[in-house]
Curated annotation (Swiss-Prot):
Compositionally biased intervals (Polar residues): 98-108, 660-672
Pfam families named in the record: DEP, DIX, PDZ
Annotated domain remarks: The DEP domain is required for cell membrane localization.
Lineage, top ranks: Eukaryota, Metazoa, Ecdysozoa, Nematoda, Chromadorea
Domain DEP: 427-501
GO molecular function terms listed in the Swiss-Prot or TrEMBL record: frizzled binding; signaling adaptor activity
Biased composition (Basic residues): 191-202
Positions of the PDZ domain: 226-294
PROSITE patterns cross-referenced by the UniProt entry: DEP, DIX, PDZ
Biased composition (Basic and acidic residues): 160-169
This protein's record includes keyword Cytoplasm: yes
Annotated protein name in UniProt: Segment polarity protein dishevelled homolog mig-5
Gene name for this UniProt entry: mig-5
Organism the protein comes from: Caenorhabditis elegans
Keywords: Cell junction, Cell membrane, Cytoplasm, Developmental protein, Membrane, Wnt signaling pathway
Length: 672
């Protein structure tokens, strides 16, 4: 009942509109001396989160406009119709949660307050009447009902309550807590007090609870304040803090400090952030150290304070005792972001967040409903509290990589060729890529052209024959994605090839034959006979006759001797007269002069002594003493010395002409 007005007090009827509603609401307020202010209207209208406007005649456009009322002392104006009219426009994202969300209902909070005060006359059945408890929808994500125990009086939030191991819905979540025998709870609480508390704060597991009562939002959830302290004309910050379960709370406010002069910080408020340093991921000592550094810097400080709604001061003596017994886990960033997103979604659907007082969800349609077992729920709960183990993160990364590989389309000629080359360069591609030897020269990480053609036919979706595969391989060679060992420009199946630069990793592209484990890598050498030069042609072989074998003699020159004639001696690898792999260097030029039925190094008219093939040295061939001109032969050059013997025991024949008796010649047989 409204108190009677005095002589200087009068009642004024005010009509107000909420948002876009056309039907006004009426409220009777008291005004002194006939002057009504916004503060008088707020005394009767207790909802917050609105902007207030009144109609006023604008002299410029000669029409009524809506003028915002910002302070409580602003006077209410009459419209042209002679009535007091106020237009209320809701503020988007006001507070931290939509109006249809909350925590515990008022009877439930009352029960928990009585438990904290250890009252002997506790009413154990406040939920017996189902009509008194509003319907509450709880999103039952895996392990989330365990987190709800964090709001109880238990000092061990990780204790698993057997009464909550169920998958019921609606308003039955808190019923076992209220209907339990209080003597047993007190004994359990006293035993748990002896256990060592967790020193670091735990991550918050958010839960979504929708209630039909609006008072639970206004009085149950904290308000976040941003307080700016200039620190100019004050001697110190004047703030003492304490840590409770990893959270930072104000324990004392010193007089004449910046906090006392501001007046908005009270004992028991939680400090969430100082300047740009958030306390959500810091331990208690780290947060206190950050606060001490900010206070000693003598610079302006911005505090983010969480103020919990409490009852009258007479209900309890120490505010910190209440905070210690009821530590509410809070993730402010996720909280605010979720609230704004839900509000915007409701507006997009044409729903008014302020008018949604209840949410009805059919059975089995909860978006995060989980049918996991108790062990799975406990595992998921531990992961969300303590973080996901490294092994699970690596397994998830491997699974994601495998899924991405499955999404890659099949290898075709239309995709980037470098993808094809990298696919064949993988260790499990099926292409034989390994270290090989050719003419005692190490060819690291090479493969044969024939194997490449086979791989393309097997793995390319649009290549079905070897001819098309050879054409595609030639394109890879021309693009530089694969390279010939001796820089040939045409592709053949009988040559060695290596990958281009950047295809193989550093661990596989290295020329070092030592593996990562410290052992020597096995190098494969070709088992086929490798000729330095070509065998004798068929016509020349017929002239040799008598089953006289010929052999190739090499010199003592270094295999890396400089030779400038390789450009004109490069031939195709597929010559039928040459060996498959040795033909990369070209054919040999056989210099011979038939004398009788065997080959000699000189004739009768040549009086210069020619050394035996086994005695030919680089100096004798270079200065022309060997009787053969041209550049010095090497094992990789085409100018070689050929000696044939009529004796099958591999004897080298050399005619040594005596200068004194030119008519008599003698043959000396040198055994090689």
């Amino acid at each position: 009942m409204e108190p009677p007005c005095t002589s200087d007090c009068s009642q004024i009827k005010v009509f107000y509109y909420l948002d876009d509603e056309t039907t006004p609401y009426v409220s009777v307020i008291e005004a002194r001396e006939g002057v009504a202010t916004l503060g008088n209207f707020k005394n009767s209208f207790t909802k917050r989160g609105y902007k207030y406007y009144a109609k006023e005649l604008d002299p410029d456009i000669q029409r009524e406009v809506k003028v915002e009322l910002t302070t409580d002392s602003d006077r209410l104006r009459k419209s042209q119709n002679g009535f007091y009219e106020i237009f209320l426009v809701s503020t988007p994202g006001y507070g931290t949660l939509p109006r249809n969300s909350g925590t515990m209902t008022r009877p439930q909070r009352t029960a928990l307050d009585k438990r904290r005060r250890r009252s002997a006359d506790f009413d154990a059945t406040p939920y017996s009447d189902a009509s008194l408890a509003p319907s509450t929808i709880v999103s039952r994500r895996a392990g989330e009902h365990l987190a709800e125990l964090y709001t109880s009086n238990s000092e061990d939030p990780y204790q698993y309550d057997e009464h909550t191991r169920r998958t019921g819905d609606d308003s039955s979540l808190y019923e076992p807590l209220a209907a339990r025998d209080m003597n047993k709870i007190y004994d359990d609480d006293r035993r748990r007090k002896k256990q060592k508390k967790e020193r670091f704060r735990r991550p918050y597991v958010p839960s979504t609870i929708s209630s039909a009562t609006e008072s639970s939002v206004n009085s149950g959830l904290p308000r976040i304040l941003e307080i700016y302290l200039p620190m100019k004309n004050v001697p110190y910050l004047g703030l003492s803090v304490c840590t409770i379960d990893g959270h930072i709370f104000v324990s004392e406010i010193a007089p004449e400090g910046a906090v006392e002069k501001d007046g908005r910080v009270n004992v028991g408020d939680q400090i969430l952030q100082v300047n740009r340093v958030s306390f959500e991921e810091l331990s208690g000592p780290q947060a206190v150290r950050s606060l001490r550094e900010a206070a000693s810097s003598k610079r302006p400080i911005t505090l983010y304070i969480s103020k919990f709604a409490r009852g009258a001061p007479s209900e309890y003596d120490d505010p910190l005792a209440s905070m210690a017994s009821e530590t509410m886990p809070l993730d402010v960033g996720v909280w605010v972001e979720t609230a704004v997103q839900n509000t915007e979604k409701m507006k997009a659907l044409g729903l008014d967040p302020q008018e949604q007082t209840a949410t009805t969800i059919d059975d089995g349609t909860l978006p995060f409903t989980s049918t996991a077992s108790d062990d799975e729920e406990r595992m998921l709960y531990d992961q969300r509290r303590n973080g996901i183990p490294r092994a699970l993160i690596e397994e998830a990364e491997r699974k994601r990589e495998n899924e991405q590989n499955e999404k890659i389309e099949q290898l075709t000629e239309m995709i980037d060729p470098i993808i094809v080359v990298r696919s064949m360069a993988r260790p499990d591609s099926g292409l034989a890529v390994k270290n090989r030897k050719w003419l005692k020269i190490l060819v690291p990480m090479s493969f044969i052209g024939r194997d490449l053609v086979d791989w393309l036919v097997d793995h390319m979706a649009d290549i079905h024959n070897r001819k098309k595969a050879r054409i595609y391989a030639a394109r890879l060679l021309a693009a530089g994605l694969i390279r010939h060992v001796v820089s040939k420009l045409t592709f053949t199946e009988k040559c060695y090839y290596v990958f281009g630069d950047g295809i193989l990793g550093n661990d596989r592209n290295s020329t070092d034959t030592t593996g990562t484990s410290g052992t020597t890598m096995r190098v494969e050498a070709t088992t086929e006979v490798t000729y330095v030069g070509s065998p004798a042609p068929h016509a020349l072989a017929a002239r040799v006759g008598r089953n006289i074998p010929h052999r190739l003699e090499t010199t003592t020159l270094s295999p890396v001797a400089h030779d400038q004639t390789w450009l004109r001696r490069r031939r195709d690898c597929e010559s039928p007269m040459t060996n498959d792999y040795a033909s990369m260097v070209g054919e040999s030029q056989i210099g011979m002069n038939p004398v009788g039925n065997y080959h000699v190094f000189g004739t009768k008219n040549n009086h210069r002594q020619v050394p035996a093939p086994s005695q030919v040295t680089s100096s004798s061939l270079t200065n022309g003493s060997g009787g053969l001109g041209g550049p010095p032969p090497t094992p990789l050059s085409s100018t070689m010395v050929l000696a044939a013997s009529p004796i099958q025991s591999q004897n080298a024949v050399n005619h040594d002409f005596d200068g004194e008796n030119s008519s008599n010649s003698r043959t000396r047989i040198l055994r090689t």
